[in-house]
Swiss-Prot record:
Protein name per the record: Uncharacterized protein C15orf61
Key words of the record: Secreted, Signal
Domain of life the protein comes from: Eukaryota
Gene Ontology terms: cellular component: extracellular region; mitochondrion
PANTHER family on file: SIMILAR TO ENSANGP00000021391
Subcellular location: Secreted
Amino acid sequence: MEALRRAHEVALRLLLCRPWASRAAARPKPSASEVLTRHLLQRRLPHWTSFCVPYSAVRNDQFGLSHFNWPVQGANYHVLRTGCFPFIKYHCSKAPWQDLARQNRFFTALKVVNLGIPTLLYGLGSWLFARVTETVHTSYGPITVYFLNKEDEGAMY
C-alpha cells in the first residue's frame, strides 16, 4: 500500500503541481484531514455535507481510506471519501461510531477493480458543474471547497 501511495503522490505532483512551471507548487499545504475537520467545524457540525477539495490544495494524508469514522468535537461522522481527479470528494453523515473496516475494504477494492474510471469521470463532471464554493480557513491559509448543490444550513438531507 505504501508503494502505491507514493506512486500516486508522484503522479499527482506531476499532473497538478507542475514543478517546472512555478514556485507555488512548493508552498506548504494543509492536510486533507485538517480541511475536513475545519469544514465540519465551520458548518457547526452539520447532519451531513458533501463537498470536493482540489488535490492541488492539500496534502493527501487520507490515501487508501474510502469509508471511515471521523470524530470532531464529540460528534462522529461516517465519511465516504474518494479521489476523483482533480478533486478529493467527501460525503459526511453524522452517525454513531461503527466498525467500517469491511466497507472501507469493499469500496477501496471497487475503485481498484473499476480502474478508477468512474471516479475520474465523476471528478471531471464535478470540475464542470461545481459552482458553489466556500472558503475553509486552515492553519496554512484559506482553501476553497466546491459543492455540486447549495447546502441549506441545518438540513437533515
